[in-house]
């Protein structure tokens, strides 16, 4: 029978020919907008982690809940768990020490210093893709082992804190003395969408180390935390892995000594698992059937657990005491000759050919084996620079212990930001340079002092544009990922920020504000910079006919140059800041995508981003003083002119350069050029979501709302790093 006859018969019976069989009628099914337009602007990234996804509600105060925690009891429960072997996932040598160290390490090790994203700070290991990464095989079991403890203590301890604390307790239980522990990591309730894990479509796709310097990626292969333990692209060559190791650990802000300490310390305890070929391993947690209840990688080999476990496919035990801290890693590394071999799963590894059988079997005390190592472990012996450090640690175990303690603390706390965010009884007293330390406050300005300072700033001769621009330059370095940057510390006045091209306004404005600070001696320079923005906005609002008081919270301090790591702060220099119409490079993403990226780092919503761009344009805050996007005949007035003129159909826009970065807006009737713009301006008229927001502020009744919304978003940015107010 023909298709026509089939359709006729269906219609004659009253059935719809297009909704039969297995059609998915569930919400979100079907072809999505991004399927049609894969380059669609990701405005949705600004809607992540809203209160709508948070079951605890916006009034939940984690710091307050943590203060109720019986911290000692929690650590006691974690210690007991380490040796409470469960039949569904038996512990190697009766201890989960190695498993929990790996869980903490792999949670923290996704951090990338280049953009501040990744890391352990939000408990992302619970969600895809990290919960199902090839490098995280079996960590689902570690998290499940922790569940009874999380259930017991509830919201007094976040998953994010619990993961790292479990790693610390595991180290301590092995006899190691850790540097300390700072709690304060707050859970989120959905995967991070903003992290660029790479554009590869297949797991374990190899990346050249040089490529890592051009993108914010933390691993040399998709789905790994760091490097391939078998060497680059399974080469089996220890020396060739050195560049990859330096690139990945360097992307976390680690130097060679920290890198050696972390690799050796992490491989002093525990083992890898490769009892048989990976073909025995089932689907990862995200792909596993519903009855698996979030557990993945079920193995069909033998019992699938214990001695039959398959994780990385490597079968390596590094030391004679895999549950107790020692210096055996370095002793074995240099004492024996190593021969390349393969694990039972076929993975490349090395065996100490001239060593006796001194390594205990994890499940049969009557058995021993030879020491084994990963390809990348031997890099620490054969790379000349790594070898020098390794030999020093071999001969000075205490130096190794100290280096690992500090490097582990840095690894697990790197994305937490300043020490002011740390809570708990084990926070170290020592300030560390990578924490961006700040001095104690010298000033406590009164309300009268603030009024007098505002008057002095207003009389200084600075323009509205200059006052607003310098405040933005100071505060907008903040990164929501690792909580670095911001106005507190006045590092705008220090190297390297004072020399950035985007901060050209600082050379004109800072001398005026510095002189004012010295003359009045009532507030820090950091406070005065932010207060200058307050004065500028209040003047601009008044010029627009709106009287408003911009909230200001004093208490910022001024950092010293010796408290500022120039190399690490250089990573905060923007390649683009659409709020100031700045673009340094054209080979990285689109201008509008980088605007979204900047807004997301500033934790802004789409409406907040929109109102800030519109307001800053009419206040003339472009980094170079250009008129791009200044769609107003009255600059310095906090008006809605940017939106009204952008959406005005009297103007037709055309590119003026081959890169389609600059545009002219001409009068459709006369052909006269009225305005110029960048992509960061025109996106608010071209993108359907942003246009909808722009229309709100372009309406005739939006003026007062616009000013209030602008002030609220502005104050949010100015206070992003005020962790002292928590």
Curated annotation (Swiss-Prot):
Database matches in PROSITE patterns: PEROXIDASE_1, PEROXIDASE_2, PEROXIDASE_4
Key words of the record: Heme, Hydrogen peroxide, Iron, Metal-binding, Oxidoreductase, Peroxidase
Cofactor: heme b
CC terms in the record's Gene Ontology section: cytosol
GO biological process: cellular response to hydrogen peroxide; hydrogen peroxide catabolic process
Catalytic activity: H2O2 + AH2 = A + 2 H2O; 2 H2O2 = O2 + 2 H2O
Region listing for Disordered, in residue ranges: 1-33
Superkingdom of origin organism: Bacteria
Keyword rRNA-binding among record annotations: no
Residues joined by cross-link Tryptophyl-tyrosyl-methioninium (Tyr-Met) (with W-105): 226-252
Tryptophyl-tyrosyl-methioninium (Trp-Tyr) (with M-252) cross-link site: 105-226
Assembly and oligomerization: Homodimer or homotetramer.
Protein's name according to its UniProt entry: Catalase-peroxidase
Gene of this entry: katG
């Amino acid at each position: 029978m023909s298709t026509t006859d089939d359709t006729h018969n269906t219609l004659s019976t009253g059935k719809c020919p297009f909704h039969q069989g297995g059609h998915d009628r569930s919400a979100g099914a079907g072809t999505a907008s991004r399927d049609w337009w894969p380059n669609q602007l990701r405005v949705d990234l600004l809607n992540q982690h809203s209160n709508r996804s948070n079951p605890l509600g916006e009034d939940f105060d984690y710091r307050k809940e943590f203060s109720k925690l019986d911290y000692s009891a929690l650590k006691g429960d974690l210690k007991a768990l380490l040796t409470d072997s469960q039949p569904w996932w038996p512990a190697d040598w009766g201890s989960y020490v190695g498993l929990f160290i790996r869980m903490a390490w792999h949670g923290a090790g996704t951090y990338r210093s280049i953009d501040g994203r990744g890391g352990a700070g939000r408990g992302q290991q619970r969600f895809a893709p990290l919960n199902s990464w090839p490098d995280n095989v079996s960590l689902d079991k570690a998290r499940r082992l922790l569940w009874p403890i999380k259930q017991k203590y509830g919201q007094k301890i976040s998953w994010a804190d619990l993961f790292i604390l479990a790693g610390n307790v595991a180290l301590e239980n092995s006899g190691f003395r850790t540097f300390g522990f700072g709690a304060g990591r707050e859970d989120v309730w959905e995967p991070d969408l903003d992290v660029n894990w790479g554009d590869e479509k297949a797991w374990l796709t190899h990346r050249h180390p040089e490529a890592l310097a051009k993108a914010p990626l933390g691993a040399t292969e998709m789905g790994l935390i760091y490097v391939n333990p078998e060497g680059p692209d399974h080469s089996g060559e220890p020396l060739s892995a050195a560049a990859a190791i330096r690139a990945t650990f360097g992307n976390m802000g680690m130097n060679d000594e920290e890198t050696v300490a972390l690799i050796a310390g992490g491989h002093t305890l525990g083992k890898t698992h490769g009892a048989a070929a990976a073909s025995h391993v089932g689907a990862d947690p995200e792909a596993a059937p519903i009855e698996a209840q979030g557990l993945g990688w079920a193995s069909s080999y033998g019992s699938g657990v214990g001695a039959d476990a398959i994780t990385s496919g490597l079968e390596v035990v590094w030391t004679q005491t895999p549950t107790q801290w020692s210096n055996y890693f370095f002793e074995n590394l240099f004492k024996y000759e190593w021969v390349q071999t393969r694990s039972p799963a076929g993975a490349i590894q090395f065996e100490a050919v001239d060593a006796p059988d001194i390594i205990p079997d994890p499940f049969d005390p009557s058995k021993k084996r030879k020491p084994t190592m990963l390809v990348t472990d031997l890099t620490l012996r054969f790379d000349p620079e790594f070898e020098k450090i390794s030999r020093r640690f071999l001969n000075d175990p205490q130096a190794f212990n100290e280096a690992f303690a500090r490097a582990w603390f840095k690894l697990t706390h790197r994305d937490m930001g300043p020490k002011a965010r740390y809570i708990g009884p084990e926070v170290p007293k020592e300030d560390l340079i990578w924490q961006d330390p700040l001095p104690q406050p010298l000033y406590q300005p009164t309300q009268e002092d603030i009024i007098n300072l505002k008057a002095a700033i207003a009389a200084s001769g600075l323009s509205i544009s200059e006052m607003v621009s310098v405040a933005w330059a100071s505060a907008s370095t903040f990164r929501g990922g690792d909580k670095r940057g911001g106005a507190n510390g006045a590092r705008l006045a220090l190297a390297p920020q004072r020399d950035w091209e985007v901060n050209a306004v600082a050379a004109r404005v800072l001398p005026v504000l510095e002189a004012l600070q010295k003359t009045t001696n009532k507030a820090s320079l950091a406070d005065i910079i932010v207060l200058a923005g307050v004065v500028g906005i209040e003047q601009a609002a008044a010029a627009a006919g709106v009287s408003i008081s911009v909230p200001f919270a004093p208490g910022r301090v001024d950092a010293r140059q010796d408290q500022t790591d120039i190399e690490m702060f250089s990573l905060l220099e923007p390649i683009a800041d659409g709020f100031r119409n700045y673009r340094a490079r054209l080979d990285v993403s689109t201008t509008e995508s980088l605007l979204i990226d900047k807004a997301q780092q500033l934790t802004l919503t789409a409406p907040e981003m929109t109102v800030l761009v519109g307001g800053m344009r009419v206040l003339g805050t472009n980094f170079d003083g250009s008129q791009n996007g200044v769609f107003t005949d009255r600059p310095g007035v906090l008006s809605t002119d940017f939106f009204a003129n952008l959406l005005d159909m009297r103007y037709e826009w055309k590119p003026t350069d081959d890169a389609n970065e600059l545009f002219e807006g001409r009068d459709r009737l006369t052909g006269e050029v009225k305005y110029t713009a960048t992509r960061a301006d025109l996106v608010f008229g071209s993108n359907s979501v942003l246009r909808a927001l722009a229309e709100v502020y372009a309406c005739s009744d939006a003026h007062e709302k616009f000013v209030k919304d602008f002030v609220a978003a502005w104050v949010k940015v100015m206070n992003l790093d005020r962790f002292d107010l928590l």
